Design a protein with these regions (language model features):
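A short His-aromatic
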Residues: 121-125
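Short, glycine-/aromatic-enriched active-site segment of Class I SAM-dependent methyltransferases
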Residues: 148-171, 180
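A short glycine-rich, Lys/Arg-flanked "PGG" loop and its adjoining helix->strand segment in the class I
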Residues: 130-142
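Residue-level marker for beta-strand->alpha-helix junctions and adjacent short loops that shape enzyme
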Residues: 153, 197-199
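A SAM-dependent methyltransferase catalytic signature shared across enzymes that methylate proteins
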Residues: 178-195
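Conserved N-terminal segment of class I S-adenosyl-L-methionine
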Residues: 1-112, 116, 120, 130-133, ...
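Conserved catalytic-core motifs of eukaryotic protein kinase domains, centered on the activation segment
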Residues: 128-129, 159
């Protein structure tokens, strides 16, 4: 996910992994790593149509084009969608300006027409995530895949009232609650993954820097922000795996819609 604005929520969070001017190296690697995984996972299935919900800047939808016949990116931010249309002009990539709180997704994307729905870091921003999950399931074909991520409650912190410190977060999820949400909408989790390596490396780098054992971080090296090196770092250090999933900031799942 690149934009929370698909649900007209507060806390818009735009990250472009290929923006060399953004110094958030590890965060960029994690964002890109999730899309690299989604494309790699889907490619052998040769999906006809993939929907990237809350596509934001559109770089993830572009990545998914390498695995799918067609990709549709969905976001409520009209300016973002227009920018993405101008930036990524490909015959099999389309962008839809859609606020899911204001209407049903199936009005623009046919019921049971989508091979896979991808939606990263979205559900935690919604007051009614079940409504979104129901819409995702509605447009999915039987046997279609749902690939999503949410922050792990173990990685979140609350204020003195017990509410999320990140005010754009309306929900806390653990694996059990996310699995229930998916199952209640006709899908079954088949894989749980995480990105613990990147988080561990980021923390280690911070510790060494604070202790003055190192004078520079990877994010201080301009060469690391090139497109080629961002992809390399995302694959090497931030590619979702099934190892040490509780050490990951985000819970990442692959679910499959039940056959009729």
């Amino acid at each position: 996910m690149s934009s929370y604005s698909a649900y007209s929520g507060s806390g818009i969070d735009q990250i472009d992994p290929f923006d060399a001017g953004d110094s958030n190296l590890w965060r960029k690697a994690e964002y890109l790593g999730r899309y690299l995984f989604a494309a790699d996972f889907l490619r052998p299935y040769k999906p006809d149509l993939v929907a990237d919900i809350s596509c934001g800047l559109g770089y993830g939808a572009l990545e998914l084009c390498s695995a799918a016949g067609r990709v549709i990116g969905v976001d409520a931010d009209r300016a973002l969608m227009e920018s993405a249309r101008q930036r990524f002009k490909m015959p099999n990539l389309h962008f839809l300006n859609k606020d899911l709180n204001a209407g049903e997704l199936s009005r623009d994307i046919a019921v049971a027409s989508v091979s896979a729905v991808v939606s990263f870091e979205t559900l935690e921003h919604l007051l009614d995530p079940a409504r979104a999950a129901a819409q995702f399931s509605e447009i999915l074909q039987p046997g279609g895949f749902f690939i999503c991520s949410v922050p792990n409650v173990l990685s979140e912190s609350g204020d003195s009232s017990g509410l999320p410190r990140n005010r754009s977060h309306k929900q806390w999820f653990n694996f059990a609650s996310l699995s229930r949400l998916v199952q209640q909408n006709g899908m079954q989790v088949i894989y749980r993954l995480g990105q613990s390596w990147s988080r561990a490396l980021f923390r280690r780098e911070q510790q060494l820097s604070n202790a003055r054992r190192i004078s520079r971080k990877l994010c201080d090296e301009p060469v690391m922000h090139s497109g080629e090196n961002m992809r390399w770092l995302s694959y090497v250090a931030a590619y979702p795996t099934v190892e040490d999933v509780d050490g990951s900031y985000s819970i990442i799942i692959v679910a499959r819609k039940n056959d009729i």
